[in-house]
Amino acid sequence: MRFVIVTGLSGAGKTQATRTLEDLGYFCVDNLPPKLISKFAEVCTQSGGNIEKVALVIDIRGGIFFDDFFEALNYLKKNEFKYEILFLEATDEVLIKRFKETRRSHPLSPDGRVLTGITQEREKLREVKNIADIIIDTSKYEIRHLREKINKNYGDHTYPEKQLSITVLSFGFKYGIPVDSDLVFDVRFIPNPFYIPELKQYSGNDEPVKDYVLKQEETVNFIEKLVDMLRYLIPNYIKEGKSQLIISIGCTGGRHRSVAIANEVYERLNKENYNSKIEHRDVAEDLHKGEKKL
């Protein structure tokens, strides 16, 4: 089990680091009192392998417990429990700017100057910084830079293609574009099986419609170009630290063309070992639109 303790200066990026670790599959706990660290570690080891990656955030708001923190670390060492400490920091100037932008007071100086709180906190955390395994100065970092750094140090690089969760989603434009889409593709230029009497009753999940749609020259060319583009985009999304990608493919009603094409794109990505799933938002809409609603 990988056990990461995240700490550092207020305003240095602990919240964003925690979110990134969560996206990487870590079970994250924020502001656990240091006295409970050893007990928490025991619970994790007794999970039967269900918990493989843990990130525990220790904030200066628990500053009165820092003696307990070092006692907990000694306990972990004595019991041969492996842990890593990630320490985040930034310059005084950058931290002051961040506090002013968020209009927050410093936790160690709620009624005074932000700089006073930063100075006190830096001194309190000196010993923790000295024993940290990784120190990240976020002074010149944008969020994406921090995500990249966290991913580089704590991501699973054995199967990098699994780091991005991909959803291929079919939909009908007449029911609206999915609001959480990252990429939207319009396949209404492809011949519509809806106007072929013997195909109208089926959906893109059924062989007759699937065969008709996928044999169209427009479909063949579109899928090849789309998959080729995704092969370029996905590794770059992973490198940037993106954790989820929703690829929405739409036709008029979301029942025939978009369903067949979304299924094919999903199968292609699946064969290339990407962490992908398929959803059909509107495939049944036309079947039920005539039913009376409660």
From Swiss-Prot:
Binding site for ATP: G8, L9, S10, G11, A12, G13, K14, T15
Lineage top rank: taxon: Bacteria
Keywords: ATP-binding, GTP-binding, Nucleotide-binding
UniProt-annotated binding residues for GTP: D59, I60, R61, G62
MF GO annotations: ATP binding; GTP binding
Keyword Nucleotidyltransferase set for record: no
The keyword Nucleotide-binding is assigned to this record: yes
Signal peptide annotation: none
Function as written in the Swiss-Prot or TrEMBL entry: Displays ATPase and GTPase activities.
Family recorded in the similarity comment: Belongs to the RapZ-like family.
PANTHER family in UniProt: RNASE ADAPTER PROTEIN RAPZ
UniProt protein name: Nucleotide-binding protein Cbei_4857
Organism: Clostridium beijerinckii (strain ATCC 51743 / NCIMB 8052) (Clostridium acetobutylicum)
